[in-house]
Structure formats: structure tokens, C-alpha cells
């Protein structure tokens, strides 16, 4: 029986039921719940099958809303990390975001230029500057990843 013909009171349940109906591998999508911004509402953190990036949703005014996309890691202190590495060029991007009330708010980034292989660093609202590789890794490693316990969408309590 299709999941989406049921009227769910939980906006996350409606989304998950839709995925389970639409995708033949819906059971391979995973989720966890965590209050990332301290507002008392659990954010829905999702990952597609074989996906490296997470999509995060929240509930505002009784509706599911996008909170953040392209998230690689959740870090201690309710920080989100976006990490992009291009092995063929040497380019790297590490962006760090604080979990704000409405959305993820940019804090700082560390990048590696694929042509010069120099490292750069910039805070929100400031111009970037060149830094040494050891400084780059010190900044990147200062954000500690949290191990998330992800569950199959089929385990979500549809209500």
C-alpha cells in the first residue's frame, strides 16, 4: 500500500512517505533527528543512498522547510561543515556554518587553489588571506565531527 495516501500530522512523515513511494530504493535513504539550533525543534538530517552529502530540514509554522543542503559533517557545537575535494586538481574547499534560528550561517572557509596549491582562509564578511598549510589543517581540524546514528527511512514513525 502506498504511504502517501495517508494524511500525516508530522511534516517529516509526509516527506519520508513520499520518498518511500517514489523511489524503488527508498528504504536505503537514511535519517536522524537532532535539534541543531537550540529552538526545541528536531531537525531532520537526511542522506540519499550512496550519498556523501546531507540535506537538513526543519519545521516552521507546522511546515517542513529546507535548512541546509550539501552538508558533509555535523560538528561539535552545532556547526555544519561543507567539504569538497577534487582529487584530480588538488582543489579543496572547507566551509563552516553555525546553526542559526532560520538557516545555517557562514562562519569561515579554508580553500586550496588548484593552480598555485596555496591555501586561503576567510571569515564571514572579510577578505581572504593566504595561510600556510599547517595553519589550514589546524583550522579544519579544530571542528570535531560528530558520529551520527543514521536509520533507514522505513524506521521513521509515520504518524
Regions found by a protein language model. Name each.
Residues 1-5, 21-22, 83-159:
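Acidic, small-residue rich beta-repeat scaffolds with periodic aromatic anchors
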Residues 1-26, 61-71:
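Blade-edge motifs of beta-propeller repeat domains
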Residues 27-36, 72-81:
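Beta-propeller blade termini
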Residues 41, 54, 93-94:
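Extracellular structured ligand-interaction cores
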Residues 47, 66-69, 107-109:
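Residue-level detector of high-confidence beta-strand sites
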Residues 49-52, 89-90:
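Short, solvent-exposed loop/turn segments at conserved positions within beta-propeller repeat blades
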Residues 53-67, 97-100:
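Beta-propeller blade repeat segments, especially FG-GAP/WD-type strand-to-loop junctions
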Amino acid at each position: 500500500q502506498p504511504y502517501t495516501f495517508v494524511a500525516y500530522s508530522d511534516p517529516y512523515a509526509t516527506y519520508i512517505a513520499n520518498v518511500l513511494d517514489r523511489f524503488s530504493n527508498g528504504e536505503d535513504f537514511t535519517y536522524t533527528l537532532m535539534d541543531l539550533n537550540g529552538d526545541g525543534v528536531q531537525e531532520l538530517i537526511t542522506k540519499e543512498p550512496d550519498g556523501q552529502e546531507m540535506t537538513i530540514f526543519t519545521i516552521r509554522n507546522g511546515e517542513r522547510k529546507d535548512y541546509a543542503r550539501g552538508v558533509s559533517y555535523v560538528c561539535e557545537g552545532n556547526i555544519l561543515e561543507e567539504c569538497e575535494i577534487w582529487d584530480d586538481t588538488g582543489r579543496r574547499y572547507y566551509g563552516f556554518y553555525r546553526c542559526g534560528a532560520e538557516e545555517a550561517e557562514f562562519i569561515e572557509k579554508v580553500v586550496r587553489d588548484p593552480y598555485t596549491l596555496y591555501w586561503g582562509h576567510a571569515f564571514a564578511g572579510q577578505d581572504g588571506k593566504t595561510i600556510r598549510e599547517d595553519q589550514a589543517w589546524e583550522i579544519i581540524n579544530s571542528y570535531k565531527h560528530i558520529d551520527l546514528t543514521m536509520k533507514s527511512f522505513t524506521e521513521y514513525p509515520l504518524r
